[in-house]
Amino acid sequence: MTKQLVPPQIPQEFLPRHIALVMDGNGRWATNRGLKRTEGHKRGEAVLLDMVDACIAMGIPYLSAYAFSTENWRRSTDEVRFLMGFNRDVLRRQRDALNAKGVRVRWVGRRPRLWRSVIRELEAAEELTKDNTTMTLAMCVNYGGRAEIVDAAREIARRSAVGTLRPEEITEDSFTQFLDEPDMPDVDLFLRPSGEKRTSNFLLWQSAYAEMVYQNKLFPDYTPEDLFAAVEEYALRDRRFGGTK
């Protein structure tokens, strides 16, 4: 990001604390231009960094980016291989820059099937940035919302079976502590470019009362101004959380 960002003037109390971002449309963007699908993913790297800068400019403390889902293993072997290497290399290339900006990187997702080299880079980024406080970037790699809930339920069942957790102790708050990143707040703004209107199994528990904003623009074409527009729309929403005002 080289140009000066001019975020909208929105009072802090009307800003989302946590944005969930589905980085959708990379493959279609490339196909529309007669390029390999991998070229769309490469372009998406720069766009994600722009989104981090935009969040910092607005004072939004949490951004969760859907980088690779548990369902993405169904893609072609070549594309999966590329995405594994690409996620590894993005972290390797960008962790120092993210650290310099005060960004704390967190990994959300499952270990099974994930390349060891990807895990090493995720853990290295977490360790390098663990004390940063400007904002938190959750890289959701090998992540699925249902898988996360199932994993949490299994751990609760295991503890109940050995007598360390009583049924009456299982509440929404205590259940949250068994999720992949329990210290992050619930999602306020669920953002999906590309024109598609679905959650795609992303942060299901955390997005129970998220405001959904769908924008008809493929992710490689997405700009900070598009993110600003989504936040402005969010700020105008009347969030009642099931109640009335």
Swiss-Prot record:
Pfam families: Prenyltransf (PF01255). Disulfide bonds: none annotated. Its cofactor is Mg(2+). It comes from the Bacteria. Substrate binds at residues 25-29, 37, 41, 69-71, 73, 75, 192, 198-200. Its EC number is 2.5.1.-. GO terms for molecular function: ditrans,polycis-undecaprenyl-diphosphate synthase [(2E,6E)-farnesyl-diphosphate specific] activity; magnesium ion binding; manganese ion binding; Z-farnesyl diphosphate synthase activity. Binds 2 magnesium ions per subunit. Mg(2+) binds at D24, E211. The keyword Transcription does not apply. The active site is at D24, N72 (proton acceptor). InterPro entries: UPP_synth-like, UPP_synth-like_CS, UPP_synth-like_sf. Keywords: Magnesium, Metal-binding, Transferase. Homodimer. Belongs to the UPP synthase family. This is Isoprenyl transferase 2. It comes from Corynebacterium diphtheriae (strain ATCC 700971 / NCTC 13129 / Biotype gravis). The gene is uppS2.
